[in-house]
Amino acid sequence: MVVPGNSHGIPRDHAIDLSDRAMDLEAEPGQSSDLKEVQKLHELVKRLEIQNQQLKIKRNPQDNHLSALNCTGVMNSINIQPEKGDLQIMPNLQSQLEQINSEKENIPALRMDAQMQYEKVCSDSKPGHKVEIHCDQDDSCFYSVDGSGRSELEEAISKMSELNSSGENILDETALDEVDVLELGSCSEDEEDCWLYVSPRKVENAEQKPDSPLKWCRQVLDHHSPETEAACRSLIGKLDQGYLSIHSALSSQSSVDSELSTSDDSISMGYKLQDLTDVQVMARLQEESLRQDYASSSASVSRRSSSASLHSLRRGTFSDQEFDTYSLEDEDDCDCSLSFRSSHRYSPSPLSSPRCQSPSAAESRATTSRIRPPRRSIQNHVQERMKYANCEDEMRHSMPNLAKTSLRSLEAVRSSRSLESDLQGPSSRLTRMQQPSTSTPPSKMRYGASNQPALTARQPIKPGVSTSSLLTSRQAIKSSGYNNSSGIRKIQSSPGLNPSGSSAVSRTGNVSSSIKHSTVKSQASMGSTVPKSKMIQPSRRSLPSAKMNSTLGDDSWKDGCY
């Protein structure tokens, strides 16, 4: 038997005690319900702590650390696994129950702490929401949170999640900066099916990319298009036409251009128009000179055609010496070289041209005589007219005052012209010189190129002696040589002069000039009497021709002829 008083002395089996404990737990369902309430309370406290930690993570890290410690301490005290949601019954269940009982005594303190923490959370988010805590008679309590408080908690949680996501985005942006961005436009150009068909718009856009001006100019200059070549040709043609027209206008101005140069070497100098007024003056002078050239050319042609019309014109407004001068000038156009004529036009002749002075003023001036080559026969007057027209056309369409003309070409043209004049036969000249002169013109004074007076006795030539005397004079001319050292034709003075009274003509160097002038007078006058003591009017080329045909052996013509 077992004595009840001795029950404490008998050791009890531990397994029996555990079974008894289990039976006691089953017998006490109220205690299990209390444990469930405590578990719910701890879970709620855990959630509140977590939310409080998330809300105050930036404000007060120390409080967060303390709350985390408190939460972990509570969790460790009851050994709750929230994911499982139940209590783990340990072998020392009795000790656990003792701890639970001790914790029941601390429930009001925990309740107050939880209430204070929750009020802090609610005051931080939005004040005015209260939390009701219901406690049972067994000191088991639970929280009943109204709907508004729950919504505020959810909003706070969502804000925290957004902040966390924004922080992650900031970190991600730093990482995205290092990533190469793909250009969708370039990817679309390299499509897989672009080899099959290419849109013409893409080709046009690719061709319309602007190039640099240097590349464009290089491309245009290297590869001429037909339109560009045609435009260049038309532009060059227009420029050539304007060039020739300007040069023809300037070549016809002998009286103005003669004052712009100083010597024969000034052929390399150019005349440049400085102002618009110069152009207008040049145009007016060109107009006047063209009119005078036309009048002189028409007068010389009509004089060659018939002596009667010439004789009738002489009695008009023009004087005999003017027509003689014009005719001699027109003949000299064919004999003189092109370069010499250009040098004549640009050589200084102070008021010696018939365009620049009146006949009355020219008669009173002491001028120089011109030495002319012998006139050609009358049968060749048609050929002379053609050559005269060709020479005039060349002069109208050439600009003699260009720097392009060289002295070498000048000398070549002079030598060719001199040879051409030498090849003229004496027979054609003799037939022209054999016509007797019916008039008896008195002797006239002529001045040479060096302002030295030379007597030329113009006496009547008898028919019987004319052939022999003229033949001897022709032989004297042919016996004289030519000196081309300076490019200018000079007739050497003949050593033997014939100072006869009636059959010979006295010469001091002007042999060819006197013969030609006498034959011109004898042909043209046809019985008319020339006025006495009248000085021969010089032509516009009198001074350069005197230079060209000077018969003096020395260079005295360089000392100044004017």
Curated annotation (Swiss-Prot):
<feature type="compositionally biased region" description="Polar residues">
    <location>
        <begin position="539"/>
        <end position="553"/>
    </location>
</feature>
<dbReference type="GO" id="GO:0031122">
    <property type="term" value="P:cytoplasmic microtubule organization"/>
</dbReference>
<feature type="region of interest" description="Disordered">
    <location>
        <begin position="292"/>
        <end position="313"/>
    </location>
</feature>
<feature type="compositionally biased region" description="Low complexity">
    <location>
        <begin position="295"/>
        <end position="311"/>
    </location>
</feature>
<feature type="compositionally biased region" description="Low complexity">
    <location>
        <begin position="345"/>
        <end position="355"/>
    </location>
</feature>
<protein>
    <recommendedName>
        <fullName>SLAIN motif-containing protein-like</fullName>
    </recommendedName>
</protein>
<comment type="similarity">
    <text>Belongs to the SLAIN motif-containing family.</text>
</comment>
<feature type="region of interest" description="Disordered">
    <location>
        <begin position="409"/>
        <end position="562"/>
    </location>
</feature>
<dbReference type="InterPro" id="IPR026179">
    <property type="entry name" value="Slain"/>
</dbReference>
<dbReference type="GO" id="GO:0035371">
    <property type="term" value="C:microtubule plus-end"/>
</dbReference>
<dbReference type="GO" id="GO:0007020">
    <property type="term" value="P:microtubule nucleation"/>
</dbReference>
<feature type="compositionally biased region" description="Polar residues">
    <location>
        <begin position="356"/>
        <end position="370"/>
    </location>
</feature>
<dbReference type="GO" id="GO:0031116">
    <property type="term" value="P:positive regulation of microtubule polymerization"/>
</dbReference>
<dbReference type="Pfam" id="PF15301">
    <property type="entry name" value="SLAIN"/>
</dbReference>
<feature type="compositionally biased region" description="Polar residues">
    <location>
        <begin position="424"/>
        <end position="442"/>
    </location>
</feature>
<feature type="region of interest" description="Disordered">
    <location>
        <begin position="344"/>
        <end position="381"/>
    </location>
</feature>
<keyword id="KW-0175">Coiled coil</keyword>
<feature type="compositionally biased region" description="Polar residues">
    <location>
        <begin position="465"/>
        <end position="531"/>
    </location>
</feature>
